């Protein structure tokens, strides 16, 4: 690519001596060479810093920021985002491996498509022994796909995070213009919150190829803090659903078992809204006779027989009747 713009790659590392050499080497060996590599050592107590100092001697593009104390992942990430210089910034985890063409393929696409604010890719899975709950669902070499186009990504965000944070490359001007940060109020799912906000500022996209290898092991956030991550993700999902409902003219502050009662007649052709209602009926914070009667009167006809049976069975199991 001619006139290659500077890309800043930000890596946060805490006690990552086992993986950090391979991770940083995969960035150094990118086919795209105009890089600024910022590594935040978050008060590691193992040999992470020593490894970083040795590898930085081999490549002047590497800048090490070392926190005196462990400040946590979100704080460290925001420190890195506060001092990068590139036209684009990328994120990668200290235990993952970028394929050589990761940055070149995405930046080339972004340079040709000005309307896209940020772009990621599929992931290739690496499963290690004792890799926790998520690892049991995959095997090494599996490809973790996500929607490719903005509208499909936004629709998926109502129900889960369709963005692989460690593959994303974003335009710096949008990040700076809107003074974005990774929010500490959303621990263990801060990336889901961040990309939900970015999706309302510009177009997101995913490259249809696995450009980063994602390592599953027992010490990562999704394994150690799986319950907390799920609870935070549930909070973000409800915020995203509320935003969508407000956007289509349904005035609800927070979607829950009470506000669900404010949704009456629904356009059967709106597949997204039907999916939202089904999701909410299957995950109410409180199941009551009132909610059941509302479902039967207004929403029963929206769903097929299988979905209706699942919802009714959920009410039967969960309903709280005060005698």
UniProtKB/Swiss-Prot annotation:
It comes from the Bacteria. It is an enzyme of class 2 (transferase). Pfam families: Glycos_transf_2 (PF00535). Keywords: Glycosyltransferase, Transferase. Its EC number is 2.4.-.-. GO terms for molecular function: glycosyltransferase activity. InterPro entries: Glyco_trans_2-like, Glycosyltransf_2, Nucleotide-diphossugar_trans. SUPFAM superfamilies: Nucleotide-diphospho-sugar transferases. Belongs to the glycosyltransferase 2 family. This is Uncharacterized glycosyltransferase HI_1578. It comes from Haemophilus influenzae (strain ATCC 51907 / DSM 11121 / KW20 / Rd).
